């Protein structure tokens, strides 16, 4: 049973949300009926509904407002997660199944911008959760340390282009820290959304960063997800970037079992990343299209692309440079998600050239 203090917090949180003019998906789908059906439930990791909704209650202007404290939460609190997933992921219904993992034929992708006129850099990332561990809010300090140990020893076995160094955040020297900041590799303690979700406990225990010698392959350990794997480089050679990520993920998967669900695909802390978990993006200069926002948005929505400012969410495009990525992560394969970005960017470049 859920204890009285937690129930009290849940009731207070529900009242606060209900009285607010929050536009979040949490507010939209957490009806009294759903709330009453779920408030007494717990996962085997001990998570309650409160662990899922507290960030959205605290930050009423969240877009989504819900996180999964562990892999089981998606099943135990399905009455709330399912409609939110359906709303966010273009009608991915309760009865739908995410397709099995498929990286596709890497060779069919190419360089988006061989002349280097438009694409500044290219990046593909995915998220993974380690089986047998809850997500951030429910991890103990001992588990954080144990996970970091597993991850660093696994990564030390990577070879060839992926070979590199693991830097624990605990006890990191000022020089190393500065170097990682200069490289834009260092992640900071979570923002207020993650803080409110209790995703930053025991910081910096168990957190670390790995990168290969060329600084083109990066692994974040215990930032928002257990693992974030990132492949990136300057220019528009998506094939090279994608190929490197696929190799890295496959190598690591041989040694670390990942949380996967038949219906939802790979499991992540935030439901927006479920499924393929893949975000393929470019920093791209589109000075002419920048002057015609409507046209830019029209092409973006046709190819399911998300357009952000230069420094990611909630920022401006500096000097006409946009961060553009695939929006869809669920109900399609990894290859399809990346190919959608590839086709959309190719189209944007074609239009930019014609203006």
Curated annotation (Swiss-Prot):
> Any idea which GO molecular function terms this record carries?
arginine kinase activity; ATP binding; creatine kinase activity
Q: Where, by residue number, does substrate bind?
A: 63-67, 224, 270, 313
Q: Which residues bind ATP?
A: 121-125, 184, 228, 279-283, 308-313
Top enzyme class of this protein?
transferase
Which residue intervals define the domain Phosphagen kinase C-terminal in the entry? 118-355
Keyword terms of this UniProt record: Allergen, ATP-binding, Kinase, Nucleotide-binding, Transferase
Signal peptide start and end residues: none
User: What is one Gene Ontology biological process annotated in the Swiss-Prot or TrEMBL record?
Assistant: phosphocreatine biosynthetic process
Q: Which GO terms describe its cellular component?
A: extracellular space
Q: What is its EC number?
A: 2.7.3.3
Q: Which Pfam families match?
A: ATP-gua_Ptrans, ATP-gua_PtransN
- Recorded catalytic activity of this chain's protein: L-arginine + ATP = N(omega)-phospho-L-arginine + ADP + H(+)
Q: Which residues form the Phosphagen kinase N-terminal domain?
A: 6-90
The source's domain of life comes to Eukaryota
Q: Which family does it belong to?
A: Belongs to the ATP:guanido phosphotransferase family.
Q: What is the name of the protein in this document?
A: Arginine kinase
């Amino acid at each position: 049973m859920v204890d009285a203090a937690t129930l009290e917090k849940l009731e207070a949180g529900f009242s606060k949300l209900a009285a607010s003019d929050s536009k979040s998906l949490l507010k939209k789908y957490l009806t009294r009926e759903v709330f009453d059906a779920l408030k007494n439930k717990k996962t085997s990791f001990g998570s309650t509904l409160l662990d899922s909704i507290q960030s959205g209650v605290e930050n009423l202007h969240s877009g989504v407002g819900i996180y999964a404290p562990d892999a089981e939460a998606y099943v135990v609190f399905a009455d709330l997660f399912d409609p939110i997933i359906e709303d966010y992921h273009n009608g991915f219904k309760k009865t739908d199944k995410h397709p099995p993992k498929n990286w596709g034929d890497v060779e069919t992708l190419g360089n988006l911008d061989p002349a280097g006129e438009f694409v500044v850099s290219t990046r593909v990332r995915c998220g993974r959760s380690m089986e047998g561990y809850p997500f951030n809010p429910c991890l103990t300090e001992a588990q954080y340390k144990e996970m970091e140990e597993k991850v660093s020893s696994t990564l030390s076995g990577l070879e060839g282009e992926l070979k590199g160094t693991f830097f624990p955040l605990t006890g990191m020297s000022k020089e190393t820290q500065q170097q990682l900041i200069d490289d834009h590799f260092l992640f900071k303690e979570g923002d207020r959304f993650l803080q409110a979700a209790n995703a930053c406990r025991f910081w910096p225990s168990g957190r670390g960063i790995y990168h290969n010698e060329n600084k083109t392959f990066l692994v974040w350990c215990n930032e928002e997800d257990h693992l974030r794997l990132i492949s990136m480089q300057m220019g528009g050679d998506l094939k090279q970037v994608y190929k490197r990520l696929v190799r890295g993920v496959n190598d690591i998967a041989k040694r670390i079992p990942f949380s996967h669900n038949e219906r939802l695909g790979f499991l992540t802390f935030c439901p927006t990343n479920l499924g393929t978990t893949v975000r393929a993006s470019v920093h791209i200069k589109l000075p002419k299209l920048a002057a015609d926002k409507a046209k830019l948005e029209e092409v973006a929505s046709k190819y399911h692309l998300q357009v952000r400012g230069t420094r990611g969410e909630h920022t401006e495009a500096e000097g006409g440079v946009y961060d553009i990525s695939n929006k869809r992560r669920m109900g399609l394969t990894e290859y399809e998600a990346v190919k959608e970005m590839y086709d959309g960017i190719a189209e944007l470049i074609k239009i930019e050239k014609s203006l």
